[in-house]
Amino acid sequence: MRPVFEWNLGARSLLLGKRTLIMGVLNVTPDSFSDGGIHFHPDDAVEFALHMLQEGADIIDVGGESTRPGATVLGTAAAGAEAGQEHAAAKTPVSESEELQRVLPVIRALKQKRPECVISVDTYRSNVARAAIEAGAEIVNDISGFRWDPQMKKTIAELRCGAVLMHMRGRPEEWRSLPPVTDMFMLVKRELREWADAATVAGIKRDRIVLDPGFGFGKNFEQNYPLLQRFQEFHELRYPLLAGVSRKSFIGRALARNGKDAPVSGRLLGTVAAEAALVLKGAQIIRTHEVRACRDAARVADIAVM
C-alpha cells in the first residue's frame, strides 16, 4: 500500500498516493538534452504545455536552464549528467535575468489560458523562485536541494508554496572526480533526511516538501539502479516521493547495442519500464517527458499498488 499525503501548495493542496501524479517537463531552453530547444519560444512552450495537459499531465514543470551534460550551472561546466555525452562542450552560464525572461512569460500565459493548471518552476535561484510563484507557479523544484542559493529555504518558507527537494551528489564540475561510494542508496537517503531537516528548521512546513533522489545527478550507471531497486525504502523518511528517470543515460546504457548506448530518441520503452517500476515501488509523482506513455503505464501500475 502506497503512503498517502496531502501536499500543501498554499492556496490549495494535491492528494498524493491515491493515484500517481504526472509532472510534464517543459524546457524553455535552447540546449536541452531531451528536446533540442524546440520549445524555446514562449508561444511554442505554452502550446506544448497545453498538449501535455491534454495528454494527462497533472503538473507542468517549467525550466529555464539546462542541466544536460556540457551545460553550465552556477558558472561551472556539467559533465556526464543526463544524456551521457561525456565530452560535450561547456556552455555559457544562464544569467538570472535571462532565466526570468525565459520562464515568466510562459508561466503567465499558461496560467491565463488554464487558470486551474498546477505549475512548478525548475530553478535553484531564490529570486527566480519568488518571481515565478508571484506569476502563478505553486511549486519550486530545486535540483540543488535548497543548498546553492543561501536564500532559497527562507524564500520558500515565506512564499508558503510547495517544494521539491532533489538530491544531487556534489556539484556538476566535480562529477568526474567524485570518490567511490560503497552504498549509494544509503548516502542519498541520509543526505535527503539531513537536507529536509534543514529545510524544516528554516521554516518550510513538512507538508509542503516532496523528496526526489535525483536519478542521474552525480550518480553513474551502477549507482542509479540501486536507487530504483530500493526506492520503496525512501518512504522511511516519511515524505512523499517524486522520481525523474525520463530518457536518462543509465537507461540508454541498459539498452546499449553493439557497445553503443541507446540515443535519447531510443529510450522511450526503457523510460516507461523504469517509470512503471517506480510506481510499483511507491513513487507518488513521476516527472517525465513522455506524458501519455507514462500516464498509461501509471494507470495500470496504480491498480497493483492500491
Where do the protein language model's features map onto the residues?
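Hydrophobic "anchor" residues on beta-strands that sit immediately upstream
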Residues: 23, 57, 118, 138, ...
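Conserved, well-structured ligand/cofactor-binding cores
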Residues: 22, 27, 32, 61, ...
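Active-site-adjacent loop and "lid" segments of alpha/beta metabolic enzymes
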Residues: 2, 9-10, 34-51, 67-80, ...
